[in-house]
Amino acid sequence: MMPLAGIAWNLMLLFSAVQGLPLQDGEGTQHPDLLNNPPKGSVEPVALEQLVHQAILKKDFLAQDVFFPGTTAIPTRAAPISLTEGVSDASGVLTTAVGGAFSLPPQLSTLIPPSPAPTGGPGPSPEAEEETTTTLITTTTVTTVHSPVLCNNNISESEGLLEAPEYGGSTFFGGLDCTYSVSVYLGYGVEIRVERLNLSKEEALSIEGLEEDRRFLLANETLMAEGQVIRSPTNHVAVRFQTYRATSPGAFRLRYQAFVLSCVFPPRPENGEVTVTDLHPGGAANFRCSAGFTLKGGESLVCLNISRPEWSGKPPVCAASCGGVIRNATVGRIVSPDISTSHSNNHGNNLSCHWLIEAAEGQRLHLHFERVSLDEDNDRLVVRSGSSPLSPVIYDSDIDDVPERGLLSDAQSLYIELISDNPAVPLLLSLRYEVFSESRCYEPFLAHGNFTTTDPLYSPGSLVSFFCNAGYMLEQGPPVIECVDPADPHWNESEPVCKALCGGEISEPAGVILSPDWPQNYGKGQDCVWGIHVQEDRRVLLEIEILNIRRSDALTVYDGDDLTARVLGQYMGVHQRFNLFSSANDVTLQFQSDSNDPVFSLSQGFIIHFKEVPRNDTCPALPEVPNGWKTSSHPDLIRGTVVTYQCEPGYDISGSDILTCQWDLSWSNAPPTCEKILNCADPGEIANGVRRASDPRFPIGSHVQYSCNEGYTLEGSRTLTCYNRDTGTPKWSDRIPKCVLKYEPCLNPGVPENGYQTLYKHHYQAGEALRFFCYEGFELIGEVTITCAPGHPSQWTSQPPLCKVAYEELLDDRKLEVTQTTDPSHQMEGGNIALAIFLPIILVILLIGGIYIYYTKFQGKSLFGFSFPASHSYSPITVESDFNNPLYEAGDTREYEVSI
């Protein structure tokens, strides 16, 4: 049996350890019944030891601090989340029932304590000697990963205020992630006004519109400013605020209100009209086409009341119809349909269309040919005066030329037939019809021109005067016609036509030159010459608006009044808009089309505007560029002057930044523009790591996140944000980080006495170097530079150096001072004068000294009658000897006698 003292000691340990410990089933501790009725074969001391050990573990366990998500053991830094359940009382796995955090799998380690030392009492029984008991201590490590505290809110009021969370003194370890979701009625949008905005670089604020499952960014913190109004085109927006700061989040205040959404105004179809009853949900848009055109699509659209109001369908189009009946006609057009989309096209590019135009009783029709382009071999146009295919033919394209003056019907109807059979050239047809009364003349028409009249009703006796648009000339008719014969009203002459001529002499201050037959295509084999003449003290400015000719055709511009003048330029093919200046008051233009081109394709032609401008020897002044400036190589813009454009920070130049004044006094390029830069430059990749960008174009507000490969750690900011600057180019929020090997840093070895370091800091990463210096008068003993060598832990390559007094340097400096003082070269000036003055004095002193020595040394008497108790020896102290004493300074090389 164990000694009584040992039993008492064990019981004391047991009660002190188990005090306050609930012993219940399932808690992992020994049941009380085991104390009274131990299992068969067990030994009492072993059971007692296990119970004591478990009690100690239990007490140790319960004494631990409770960890909140994202905290250490410091209670004041706990996140503001209530703890719903404490630590489990089980001695197995430790669990923390806290929302907003998650734990990594526990890491278990088993410790085997040493066996207790044997006591002095009797040993255990033989049965106990055969049974060995091992106590296992299981340690559970719980790693808590911090996650941001959520603070979401759903709002359905039509107006309100959104503000940043208030800081109540709690620590938001892991940051905040707040989403304010605002929803209003369908058919309404959300208008947000920024009343206050004060955020740091570690905070982000974004406003997004929501439409079904799609999100689209409306604004973020880089594009927001106080007073700004942001409108969502849908009835649902989300405001998200994120901060990575643990305390005192930034401030913002957004005031929102609902506003009525509307559909956009529908586009008016070409050759048609649209009327809208209301743009708000429920409103309708009605479409109709002009005569001769058919509506393709719905006649009416409704504005739908959805999250983003929109029309119930796509706007229709007005397509030229292939045939049809036009009753009670007044004024309109017949246009050739598109062969590829015509509903009557059932046989490739074949087309057969029939139109019937009917006027009211007692009226007639006038048909004018505005534009006609037919394939002579495959197209045919027939016009009949009547209402059936058997009516008399008044025009047949296979027989007649195009009637420039138009056609008159003999009755109240016209029957038009168009047939096209795989044409080789595009089919173009535009016929204008007009109804007029038999008691008056019809209204004249002049394509590419206009007219004036004395009677808007065109009654008999009225006069009409014609004139053409710029670039056209009146042909094939008089400039003035008269309505005659009251019994059968008609014009005494046909209307003239306005044509773009092939060449001519022009003596006007401004005008237009068109390619022959513009806007129709010019023919081949043409040679046209235009002469432009302005006042003698002026020159000509040519503005080429359109130049679209074949590559085998040429437009040549001469700087003079004939074809022998200097060539300003020769152009073929297609060119963008440009300008030319003449040096004098005459310019000649020549256009030649190739007559031998076997593959003659249709080309648009050209439009050239001209005007007289002051004659000078400088190029025209260049405009200032918004958000930029220009510099000139010469104050006067003479020939050869170079003008350079530059943009302000935050803007990029678009176009040519260098312009040169050419020989013809025109600029080599158009002035550029400065466009706002909305993207950051590529921050670059990192070695031994990867990056993830939210947008590969790096626009303002985008993010780039960096991470390192295994075995490396990130040094620097993990996330870079592209933010806008009012006065500069968009910039990243921080420098690009780098990935360094995972080594423990070296601690600062300290500063040597009488010395200093460069780049002083507490920790140095592996590979970093530290350099030492000594103050003046001290020399460095040891390595000047030491490096942090990687390892576990990292160590310095050598011990830090020492700073020792530099004795030799001090002596050398003093020798130098003495040498400089006694150097004869410094005493050459005035040496003769000094010798003449002091030489007699020195001789007198030597004479007196000799007499004194004679009497005192050899005669044993005092020269002046004084006696000394003893004669002391003295030794001369020279400069050489005083050099051995660093505290002694000599000023010259003379010897001194010292008597002590």
Swiss-Prot record:
Extract one GO BP annotation from the record.
synapse maturation
**Cystine bridges: which residues?**
C151-C178, C263-C303, C289-C318, C322-C353, C441-C483, C468-C498, C502-C528, C619-C661, C647-C674, C680-C722, C708-C739, C746-C788, C774-C803
Q: Where in the cell is it found?
A: Cell membrane
Provide the residue span(s) of the region labelled Disordered.
111-130
Q: Which domain of life is it from?
A: Eukaryota
Q: Which Gene3D superfamilies match?
A: Complement Module, domain 1 (2.10.70.10), Spermadhesin, CUB domain (2.60.120.290)
Q: How does it sit in the membrane?
A: Single-pass type I membrane protein
Q: Which UniProt keywords apply?
A: Cell membrane, Disulfide bond, Glycoprotein, Membrane, Repeat, Signal, Sushi, Transmembrane, Transmembrane helix
Which portions of the chain have biased composition (kind: Pro residues)?
113-125
CDD domains assigned:
CCP, CUB
TM spans (from-to): 833-853
Under Pfam families, the record lists: CUB, Sushi
Q: Which GO terms describe its cellular component?
A: endoplasmic reticulum; neuronal cell body; plasma membrane
InterPro entries of this UniProt entry? Answer: CUB_dom, SEZ6_CSMD_C4BPB_Regulators, Sperma_CUB_dom_sf, Sushi/SCR/CCP_sf, Sushi_SCR_CCP_dom
Record keyword Cell membrane present: yes
Glycosylation is annotated at N154, N198, N220, N305, N328, N350, N450, N492, N616
Signal peptide positions on this chain: 1-20
Domain Sushi, which positions? 261-320, 439-500, 617-676, 678-741, 744-805
Domain annotation CUB: ranges: 151-259, 322-436, 502-613
Q: Its function?
A: May play a role in cell-cell recognition and in neuronal membrane signaling.
- Cross-referenced PANTHER family, in alphabetical order? PROTEIN CBR-CLEC-78, SEIZURE 6-LIKE PROTEIN 2
Please report which protein family the annotation says this sequence is part of.
Belongs to the SEZ6 family.
Name of the protein in question: Seizure protein 6 homolog
Supply the source organism's classification: Eukaryota, Metazoa, Chordata, Craniata, Vertebrata
Q: Which gene encodes it?
A: sez6
